[in-house]
Amino acid sequence: MHELSYATSVLNAILDAVKQQEELGRKVIKVNDINLEIGDLTLLSVDQLQFVFEVISEDTVCKGAELKAEIVKPKIFCMDCEFEGNLDTKDELEVACPKCESRNVKLKGGKEFNIVNATIEFDDEE
């Protein structure tokens, strides 16, 4: 379950951001949601990621935060016919150009894992 390592990375990054805000004198009440970009080729389960995140964030300001994920589809570039477009990820082990069926291709994207932003509730907000 590699979701645990990803969830831990998200939690640590958000807690670092919270700490920075608190060092600036802002009191963080809680983190409401965290928006992520997740590449389809990471093979992460968003449901499992959310579950693990809930468990590890239990005693933090992230308790109850919802992870919202945008799945990023990989693109393919064919070195033979120069086709560029979306890759069907039904079977990632058989990557071929959908136009000419060449296997001389480069993958572009689909392995991302980024924190886009987070909604944080501060004590000084009304």
Swiss-Prot record:
Metal-binding recorded as keyword: yes
Protein name: Hydrogenase maturation factor HypA
Gene3D superfamilies hit by this protein: 3.30.2320.80
The keyword Zinc belongs to this UniProt entry's keyword annotation: yes
GO biological process: protein maturation; protein modification process
Disulphide bonds in the chain: none
Organism for this UniProt entry: Methanococcus maripaludis (strain C5 / ATCC BAA-1333)
Record's keyword terms, sorted: Metal-binding, Nickel, Zinc
Name of encoding gene: hypA
Example GO molecular function: nickel cation binding
Binding site for Zn(2+): 78, 81, 97, 100
Pfam families reported for this sequence: HypA
Function statement: Involved in the maturation of [NiFe] hydrogenases. Required for nickel insertion into the metal center of the hydrogenase.
Lineage: Archaea, Methanobacteriati, Methanobacteriota, Methanomada group, Methanococci
Stated family: Belongs to the HypA/HybF family.
Residues noted as binding Ni(2+) in the record, renumbered to the chain: 2
InterPro entries named in the record: HypA/HybF
